[in-house]
Design a protein with these regions (language model features):
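Short Pro/Gly-enriched beta-strand edge/turn motifs at strand-loop
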Residues: 73-82, 135-144, 240-244
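Extended C-terminal subregions enriched in glycine
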Residues: 100, 148, 181, 190-251
C-alpha cells in the first residue's frame, strides 16, 4: 500500500500545489483524480510478490506518474479510469514489404491472457486457448469437438489491384477486427483518406451481436463511438433508435491498425496512434 503514497505524491511534480491553497477545490480535485488513477493500478497489480510479479519500480517512478497524470482533466472529474501501461501481452500485427513488391500481412494471438499457459517441453512457445470460442451446444455448427478448429477473430488483411499487391494491412482488437477492417477500407476507397488518415480517423464499434459461442443478441446490442465523434451525430443516432454507450478508449476496443501500400512504385506506411508501433523504411 505504501506504493500508493509515492504515486499520489508525484502530482507535486506536475502541478504547483503550494499556490492552489490548502483544501482549495482545485487541490482537492487534482488530488482525488490522482488517487483514482493510483487505485486502478492497486486493483490490478497489488498482490503477494511471492506469487506474482508486481512492477513496483515502474509504479512508483516519477516518469510513470507524470504520464498517468496527463489523463487528469482539470475541468472535470473522471468517471472511468483504467490501470496503467503494464498490460499483459495480446494480439500483435505487423506487415512488411520488399524491393520486389512482395508483401506479408501477419497477425498473431494466443488469445485470452497470453494463451493456455501450457508450454510444450523444449519448444519455448505457449499454446493458444481459442477452444474457448467453441459453443457448448452439441447441435451448434461451432460445437466443441476433437480435431475441429474453433471460431476465431484473426484477420491478416490484404487488398490486390489488377491482381497485384496493393495494400497489406491489419487491425487488432478481437471482435472489432471485421468492423475496423471494413471502416478502414471505406475510409481509403470511398472517403479518399490517405493510408495514415484512414487509421487515425474516429471509429465506432457495435457490441452485443449473436456469437458463434451461442450468445444471442438482445435489444439490438449497443453502439460505442470514439470521443472525437461529435454530439450532433450522437443525437442523430439516438433518434434512429441506436443504444449508445461509452467505453474506455484506452483498452484497444477500437482496434490497432498498421498498413503498407504500394502505389505508382512507391511504398507508403502507416501506424495509428491508438497503439504502440511505427512505420519505417530501409
Amino acid at each position: 500500500h505504501s506504493c500508493l503514497v509515492g504515486s499520489e505524491m508525484c502530482i507535486r511534480d506536475r502541478y504547483d500545489i503550494a499556490n492552489m491553497g490548502l483544501n482549495s477545490a482545485e487541490y482537492i480535485h487534482i488530488f482525488t483524480e490522482a488517487k483514482k488513477l493510483a487505485y486502478e493500478d492497486r486493483a490490478k497489480y497489488y498482490a503477494d510478490m511471492k506469487f506474482t510479479n508486481v512492477p513496483v519500480k515502474e509504479l512508483i517512478s516519477k516518469e510513470y506518474a507524470l504520464e498517468r497524470n496527463k489523463l487528469i482533466n482539470l475541468k472535470k472529474a473522471g468517471s472511468v479510469y483504467d490501470s496503467g501501461i503494464f498490460e499483459n501481452g495480446d494480439t500483435i500485427y505487423l506487415t512488411v514489404a520488399d524491393k520486389d513488391g512482395n508483401m506479408v500481412s501477419l497477425i498473431q494471438s494466443n488469445y485470452r491472457g497470453m494463451g493456455s499457459g501450457m508450454v510444450p517441453p523444449n519448444l519455448g512457445f505457449m499454446l493458444q486457448d481459442r477452444g474457448e470460442m467453441f459453443s457448448l451446444d452439441p447441435n451448434h455448427r461451432n460445437s466443441l469437438q476433437g480435431g475441429k478448429r474453433p471460431f476465431h477473430t484473426i484477420i491478416p488483411a490484404f487488398i490486390t489491384k489488377d491482381g497485384k499487391p496493393f495494400i497489406s494491412f491489419g487491425l487488432m482488437g478481437g471482435a472489432m477486427q471485421p468492423q475496423g477492417h471494413a471502416q478502414i477500407v471505406v475510409n481509403i476507397i470511398d472517403f479518399k483518406l490517405n493510408l495514415q488518415e484512414a487509421g487515425d480517423a474516429p471509429r465506432f464499434r457495435h457490441f452485443g451481436s449473436s456469437e458463434p459461442t451461442g450468445e444471442i443478441m438482445l435489444d439490438g446490442g449497443f453502439l460505442s463511438l470514439e470521443s472525437r465523434i461529435n454530439d450532433q451525430i450522437r443525437n442523430e443516432l439516438l433518434k434512429l433508435g441506436h443504444n449508445l454507450k461509452g467505453v474506455n478508449d484506452e483498452k484497444g476496443v477500437y482496434g490497432g491498425y498498421q498498413a503498407i501500400m504500394l502505389k505508382d512504385g512507391v511504398y507508403y506506411g502507416a501506424s495509428e496512434s491508438r497503439k504502440d508501433g511505427h512505420a519505417s523504411g530501409y
